[in-house]
């Protein structure tokens, strides 16, 4: 089954519940996770590969949760977390990392990440964490 995810270059806002933004530059990983989040979690998923795409997608589509890779090209996921914090965004964010050291967890939390998720992980575990965040998340400011 070919997976489709939503790309609206004209910044069309969709009033869809459970909007997720996945930011990861690994195409294979992203495709598998996107498929699983949509098919098994029932989420509407947007995908961004680089920092500037993340910020544009947040502004346009107002996702409920950001799944953010710490190793994005150029400046990385921590740069995105700093930008979100500086701009006053309060978006539930799950930082995904292959190296969940105490320092990474501390730094991510200080920059506003809701949770640090070690890679690799099962998509079911991610779906459960997203559902948990959606239940307890206050309204987000975008």
Give the role of each language-model region.
Residues 79, 100-115:
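Alpha4 helix (beta4-alpha4-beta5 surface) of REC/receiver domains from two-component response regulators
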Residues 56, 78-89:
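Short amphipathic alpha-helix used as the core "switch/output" element in two-component signaling
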Residues 50, 76-79:
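Acidic catalytic/metal-coordinating carboxylates
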Residues 47-65:
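Acidic, metal-coordinating helix/loop segments flanking the phosphotransfer/catalytic sites
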Residues 27-46:
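Two-component/phosphorelay signaling modules centered on CheY-like receiver
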Residues 1-19, 29, 124-142:
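Non-catalytic signal-transmission and effector/linker regions of two-component phosphorelay proteins
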